[in-house]
């Protein structure tokens, strides 16, 4: 037999062996946190597409074999197995990722998306194990919290050692799972969604950019495009935390913007914010609304959010309140909240929610 024929035969045998090994695994049931597009094409494995921050997946099983399947060269993840130290998975691409040295027995697994990807999406193809493994019960949390906001809610550059960051440094040091939202939710063993995007506001984005968009125009969709409206009958958060206004008011108006005065911007912001909360309330009648804002911009943000709360309460929506936070060091990228700041904000929210009666 010619050498190249032998090489081809061996390659074919190895490929067949690899395919056989892949076919011998089975997908595990999983629990999804965050907005995810679940697709089940004919004769194809289920896929889970995402773009919003802080999405997570969980599974549990009894066995000793675990492989994660990715199709994502955009995001950074952390993998937590049995509450052990997290393992960082950096832009895995299209790959099968085996978990090494897994002992026989019961295991709980959690995969968390860390990074912000405003213009791209990624796909997770699931957790896989060997046929002899036994799936175990998935989390069935009764508590749900939704966080809606901008870069402060995203955790923009929150783990950076410096305020000065390149785009790549910003990407690598943004850890949405260390932002105040997930920290707060985990303290209550609550499922959570982080529906936030850096630079966006209620009616105006940072320095007037992308005037045809706002966080309110992005919010209705499952992904960062208008192809799929988000609907999940099981998502009924008892608490909705909104932090929007920094981008609306942190810069002066430009000549080409549609508001000719600051007062016109204020009125538009308040009217649209009130309308947005009312829409959320119509779908979540029991939800407690917390409108958070900093003391920045000489109190302008706090004043306008206060008007929103007053109008909502005046219209009969009483389960709404304002929290103004101060005292942050803003040592993250580009003067954003640091991981230490995020913990302070989480502590503020945790204490506040612990004092609320009957919200769960």
Curated annotation (Swiss-Prot):
It catalyses: Deacetylation of xylans and xylo-oligosaccharides. SUPFAM superfamilies: SGNH hydrolase. The keyword DNA repair does not apply. Gene3D superfamilies: Galactose-binding domain-like (2.60.120.260), SGNH hydrolase (3.40.50.1110). The record marks 336 as: Increases nucleophilicity of active site Ser. InterPro entries: CE2_N, CtCE2-like_dom, PCW_deacetylase/CE, SGNH_hydro, SGNH_hydro_sf. One of its GO terms (cellular component) is extracellular region. This is Acetylxylan esterase / glucomannan deacetylase. The lineage of its organism: Bacteria, Pseudomonadati, Pseudomonadota, Gammaproteobacteria, Cellvibrionales.
């Amino acid at each position: 037999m010619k050498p190249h024929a032998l090489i081809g035969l061996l390659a074919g045998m190895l490929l067949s062996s690899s395919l056989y090994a892949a076919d011998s695994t089975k997908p595990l049931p999983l629990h999804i946190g965050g907005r995810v597009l679940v697709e089940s094409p004919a004769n194809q494995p289920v896929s889970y597409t995402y773009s919003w921050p802080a999405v997570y997946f969980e599974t549990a099983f009894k066995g000793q074999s675990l492989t994660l399947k990715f199709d994502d060269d955009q995001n950074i993840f952390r993998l937590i197995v049995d509450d052990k130290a997290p393992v960082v998975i950096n832009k895995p691409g299209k790959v099968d990722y085996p978990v090494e040295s897994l002992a026989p027995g019961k295991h709980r697994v959690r995969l968390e998306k860390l990074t912000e990807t405003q213009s791209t999406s990624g796909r997770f193809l699931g957790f896989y194990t060997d046929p002899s493994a036994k799936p175990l019960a998935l989390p069935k949390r009764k508590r749900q919290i939704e966080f809606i906001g901008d870069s402060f809610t995203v955790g923009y550059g929150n783990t950076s050692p410096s305020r000065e960051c390149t785009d790549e440094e910003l990407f690598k040091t943004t850890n949405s799972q260390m932002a105040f939202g997930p920290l707060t939710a985990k303290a209550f063993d609550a499922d959570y969604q982080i529906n936030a995007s850096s630079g966006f506001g209620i009616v105006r984005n940072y320095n007037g950019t992308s005037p045809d968009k706002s966080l309110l125009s992005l919010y209705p969709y499952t992904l960062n495009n208008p192809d799929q409206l988000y609907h999940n009958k099981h998502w009924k958060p008892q608490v909705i935390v909104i932090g929007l206004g920094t981008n609306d008011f942190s810069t002066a108006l430009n000549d080409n913007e549609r508001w000719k005065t600051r007062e016109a911007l204020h009125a538009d912001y308040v009217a649209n914010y009130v309308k947005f909360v009312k829409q959320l309330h119509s779908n979540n009648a029991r939800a407690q609304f917390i409108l958070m804002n900093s003391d920045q911009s000489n109190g302008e943000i706090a004043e306008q959010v206060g008007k929103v709360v007053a109008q909502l309460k005046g219209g009969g929506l009483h389960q709404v309140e304002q929290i103004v936070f101060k005292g942050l060091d803003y040592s993250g990228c580009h003067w954003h909240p640091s991981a230490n700041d995020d913990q302070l904000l989480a502590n503020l929210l945790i204490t506040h929610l612990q004092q609320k009666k009957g919200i769960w």
